[in-house]
Amino acid sequence: MSKPINSVVSKVISVLGLLALMSPLNVTAQSDEITFHKDIEPILQRSCQNCHRVGGVGPMPLVTYDQVAPFAGLIEYKTGLRDRAGAMPPWYMEKDIGIQDYKNDPSLNDKEIVAISTWARSGTPKGDIADAPEPLVFDDSLKWTAGEPDLIVRTNSVTKLAGTADWWGEIDRVPVSIEQDRYVKSVEVVEVNDVNNTTGTGRDTVGGRYIFHHMIWSTAELDEDGNRVEESVTGWPVHEVGRNPDIFDPEGGRLLRSGTYIYSDSVHLHSNGQDTTGHLEIGFRFHPLGYEPKYERVSLGLGNGVDISIAGNQDNQELHAYTVLEQHTKFITFEPHLHAPGERMCLEAIWGYTVETLACVGYDHNWVRGYAFEDDAAPLLPKGTIMHIVGYMNNTETNPNVPDPRNWQGSGNRSVTNMFIDLGMRVKMTDEQFHEEMENRRQVLNLSPNDHVIGCPLCGAPLVAPMAGNEEASD
């Protein structure tokens, strides 16, 4: 017996209507799906592949889908650490406090971290190859991240045997081969050794690829006995494992004198697990001939390396250090330096009744990072400002960098003893330069009387009290 025609038509219409309703949802679901080629690969290219590729220093390449998918869970975990020790990429600036504008920032934003987690937990869908970005091409003959140097100075090679004790001491002086004094806009130190970057040494840490833990160095003329002529000394940022290049303020270049030598009486070598021969290459990039710096560097004793006391088996221990700015000062970088139990450092500026946090940074002793403020975000602080750093120490078994948390720790050079310093770069300014910098900041940021600039307590003063500013100008 045939069914009534109106019943059949009704069911067909119902099915077609249901399909019509479902189809847009299905298309939307497909377009919203997090896939490797569309969503994950661009993140890896920007923030990971410089190290995680064949020939890079990362422990595994993260270029193709087949290379990345097996490590999806680990990548989710490492990126989810955000600003704590062990996080990848190794950038530990906290994003919920202080200044947030930095140069060469490879960190992931919240949306990217969530995308990686979603992708890892949804079966690592590959997606359409048509969505993939163009593959990056790396030139392994270029080892300089700040740009090709104008001058490269090489130290003499040294050999560190597998399993031997750490060594501290001097290395040979090396001449700086330039015919005239030059101002330097950036300096970068890299270790070149015979470790096979493909096979590694069996050590998982960054230091496992290298034998130089650090070098404190300067350039100076030498007297007939080979000693430094003190008035000729120029200090340079310390080289440490995992350190990024040092780029000086564009108007505060540092002087490299002709006739000087690379001088270091504080080099730390360590075994990486296999016999290794290596040397350091120091790359200087110069300002053009005729350049004269507008600003001079200023050294601040902001830290404590003398009377540190860290109890065993205790977390959340704090260290504090203060100094007062004797000149108007522009902060170029913030570089927290702690040792094994260090987990975090914050930088504060105290001006009048205002206590302001400029930055808080997680700390990982495997990666010693400097954080360069963007030009229009660099702190501009008046003389008389009290600078304050706070170090947070974790001397418990939850800190994998601590070999035995039962031990009390004091001050010292070794990683199992402690330092607590801000090694950042700063320049000093005259009254006129300070006011000029603040006026430029007001113009660039288009500040109104209701705006506040972190790290520049007086930037808004002429906007809030213009009459007072005019009276001072007339005086």
Positions of the model-derived regions?
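Solvent-exposed, flexible loop/coil segments flanking beta-strands in beta-rich domains
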Residues: A132-R203, G273-P341, T398-A473
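Noncatalytic modules at the cell exterior or secretory-pathway interfaces
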Residues: V184-K185, G253-H270, P379-N395
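Short acidic/polar inter-strand loop motif in beta-rich domains
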Residues: G123-G127, L269-Q274, Y392-N401
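Extended, compositionally biased non-globular segments
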Residues: V324, I332-S415
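Bacterial N-terminal signal peptides
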Residues: K11-P24
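Aromatic- and Gly/Pro-enriched helix-to-coil junctions and flexible linker segments
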Residues: T28-V174, S186, G259-D265
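Short, surface-exposed beta-strand/strand-loop-strand elements in extracellular ectodomains
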Residues: G200-L222, R344-Y353
